[in-house]
């Protein structure tokens, strides 16, 4: 690590997983990861709506009181959703750890789920989230790649779009399903692990009900295909490759190589990344341009170059450095044997065109 060596350990108290990494700084970050992302959703968008319900009124505190108290302590809360998790997090001064452990526990255990909050706050916020995502052609391309590749499970939409009706009872039922000990992991950054474990055991987190672990229960079956979406603004052409866990190192190095100065065509690549899940991953690459003709030319060049084969071993140390820096500030570090990454040759892939699709290529033209 580039900073001082940090001690990391995991504890399992009554099926509740707790992991922490201490540090010498004055600021701590506490996260509660819930295995309840969109891949596990009982209805499209219910995970997003549940995430948006976090930090509203609970049985012990009003939303206003919760916000005001945290502000007086200089802290802040956040709730996010992705395909794997709903994550509740708080950033605060180290000495205020007990308050924020109890605050997050209160949200998971005693959120009130009041009808007026759904209509007046949760739905408008979720609708805004979806509108922002729809306005971004890269986000639209990513959503389409997942839909094409997985169809179900990981292919479900992350954000609520209003297509499938979700009621307050649906949200409460989903909370009951995912807010259980088996689906919750408490992560601390800049926090002493023994202290965190003690405060967690003294909080309502220890009183969460038992349930069924959802990890690995999502449908990760993959498919081949392409999609084309008309979209005003910039045009995006994107490809995706499903990745087995055994190949994570190769695609991690590849993603970082493609956006580095080590790759001659990196100026053409808008974004490349590897999304890692419990049962596999998805590598995706995006080309973006205000002109569809340029996006078309760029994706053809990049795909042709990758089909010819690349020696990505030159990027192993670059990728290792980036990963080390990220791990240094992560409560849950990623461990990959990057030295195994050598040659890469692009084979089958899924393809999505977003924007001026009349002037973007089809998959069989790449």
Swiss-Prot record:
Pfam families: Peptidase_M16 (PF00675), Peptidase_M16_C (PF05193). Residues 1-15 form a transit peptide. Component of the ubiquinol-cytochrome c oxidoreductase, a multisubunit transmembrane complex that is part of the mitochondrial electron transport chain which drives oxidative phosphorylation. It is found in: Mitochondrion inner membrane. Component of the ubiquinol-cytochrome c oxidoreductase (cytochrome b-c1 complex, complex III, CIII), a multisubunit enzyme composed of 3 respiratory subunits cytochrome b, cytochrome c1 and Rieske protein, 2 core protein subunits, and additional low-molecular weight protein subunits. The complex exists as an obligatory dimer and forms supercomplexes (SCs) in the inner mitochondrial membrane with cytochrome c oxidase (complex IV, CIV). One of its GO terms (biological process) is mitochondrial electron transport, ubiquinol to cytochrome c. One of its GO terms (molecular function) is ubiquinol-cytochrome-c reductase activity. It comes from the Eukaryota. This is Cytochrome b-c1 complex subunit 2, mitochondrial. It comes from Eremothecium gossypii (strain ATCC 10895 / CBS 109.51 / FGSC 9923 / NRRL Y-1056) (Yeast). Belongs to the peptidase M16 family. UQCRC2/QCR2 subfamily. Keywords: Electron transport, Membrane, Mitochondrion, Mitochondrion inner membrane, Respiratory chain, Transit peptide, Transport. It is a peripheral membrane protein. One of its GO terms (cellular component) is mitochondrial crista.
């Amino acid at each position: 690590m580039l900073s001082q060596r940090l001690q990391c350990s995991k504890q399992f108290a009554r099926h509740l997983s707790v992991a922490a990494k201490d540090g010498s700084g004055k600021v701590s970050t506490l996260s509660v990861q819930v295995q309840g992302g969109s891949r596990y959703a009982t209805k499209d968008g219910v995970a997003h709506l549940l995430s948006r319900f976090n930090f509203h009124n609970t049985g012990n505190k009003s939303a206003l009181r919760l916000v005001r108290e945290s502000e007086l302590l200089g802290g802040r809360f956040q709730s996010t959703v992705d395909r794997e998790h709903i994550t509740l997090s708080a950033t605060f001064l180290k000495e205020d750890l007990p308050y924020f452990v109890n605050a997050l526990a209160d949200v998971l255990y005693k959120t009130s789920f009041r009808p007026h909050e759904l209509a007046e706050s949760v739905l408008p916020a979720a609708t805004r989230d979806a509108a922002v995502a729809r306005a971004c052609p890269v986000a639209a391309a990513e959503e389409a790649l997942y839909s094409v590749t997985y169809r179900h499970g990981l292919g479900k939409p992350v954000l609520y779009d209003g297509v499938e009706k979700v009621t307050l009872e649906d949200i409460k039922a989903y909370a009951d399903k995912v807010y259980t000990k088996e689906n919750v992991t408490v992560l601390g950054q800049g926090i002493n692990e023994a202290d965190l474990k003690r405060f967690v055991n003294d909080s309502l987190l220890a009183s969460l009900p038992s349930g069924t672990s959802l990890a690995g229960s999502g449908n990760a079956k993959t498919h081949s295909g392409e999609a084309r979406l008309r979209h005003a603004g910039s045009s995006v052409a994107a490809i995706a490759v499903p990745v087995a866990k055994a190949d994570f190192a190769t695609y991690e190095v590849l993603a970082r190589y493609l956006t580095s100065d080590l790759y001659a065509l990196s100026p053409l690549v808008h974004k490349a990344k590897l999304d890692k899940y419990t049962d596999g991953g998805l590598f995706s690459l995006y080309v973006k341009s205000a002109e569809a003709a340029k996006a078309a030319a760029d994706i053809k060049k990049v795909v042709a170059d990758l089909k010819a084969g690349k020696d990505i071993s030159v990027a192993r140390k670059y990728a290792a450095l980036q990963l080390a820096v990220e791990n240094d500030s992560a409560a849950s570090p990623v461990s990959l044997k990057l030295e195994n990454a050598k040659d890469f040759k692009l084979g089958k892939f899924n393809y999505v065109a977003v924007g001026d699709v009349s002037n973007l290529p089809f998959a069989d033209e790449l």
